[in-house]
A protein has these predicted regions:
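Central antiparallel beta-sheet cores of small beta-barrel/beta-sandwich binding domains
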Residues: 41, 45-126
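Surface-exposed interaction patches
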Residues: 106-109, 115-127, 131-138, 142-151
């Protein structure tokens, strides 16, 4: 029983790092992957495992050699919409910083192998309230070109939920479906 308890406690202390992905392929180059038109599908799950909302995102990305700009158009399951523009600077061979209107300060991130990890603080609209939250965001590129994203959201240091997203290049969506990708209606 003591050994089982020790193993459980040691597993709780393990944290995923960028180093865990450094030799994984295909290599994720953020500015290459996000240049052009993409479609994302996602959901937000609260800390109790309840899906609170689902959404699609139509994304247009441009890279000028130093700055990646992402224009994101969200459509939520209740038919509400939101526009967000991320401006992401490449600050080193594998490092990035980004800003968007509701971000508090800068988002800081590192690409490693097939992954991208970044953290940031954000003003999140929740009903008629605005909550200050922290995102711990991991993206992992799959061999089929799908980019999976898991973002854990914290408020006052307590996990309030998780965002799950799946990104695909719009051309890949059109090829698979035989027609142009469309936002949920």
């Amino acid at each position: 029983m003591l050994i089982l308890t020790l193993l459980t406690l040691s597993a709780c202390g393990m944290t995923m790092t960028e180093k865990d992905f450094e030799n994984q392929t295909p290599k994720l180059v953020l500015e290459d992957y996000f240049s052009g038109n993409l479609v994302a599908t996602g959901l937000f799950e609260d800390r109790f495992g309840n899906i609170r909302t689902q959404f699609t995102v139509d994304i247009t990305g441009t890279f000028d050699g130093k700055t990646l700009t992402l224009d994101e158009n969200f459509v939520y399951s209740d038919q509400s919409t939101e526009f967000r523009r991320w401006v992401i600077e490449k600050t080193g061979p594998n490092s990035y910083s980004g800003t968007t209107e509701n971000a508090i300060g800068e988002a800081l991130g590192t690409a490693s192998g097939n992954s991208f990890h970044w953290t940031y603080k954000f003003r999140l609209n929740v009903g008629d309230d605005v909550w200050k939250v922290k995102f711990d965001d991991w993206m992992v590129l799959q061999p089929n070109g799908v980019l999976l994203n898991k973002a854990t959201v914290y408020r006052w240091g307590i996990k309030i939920g998780t965002v799950f997203l799946s990104f695909r290049k719009q051309a890949a969506v059109e090829a698979a479906d035989g027609e142009p990708a469309r936002l949920a209606s």
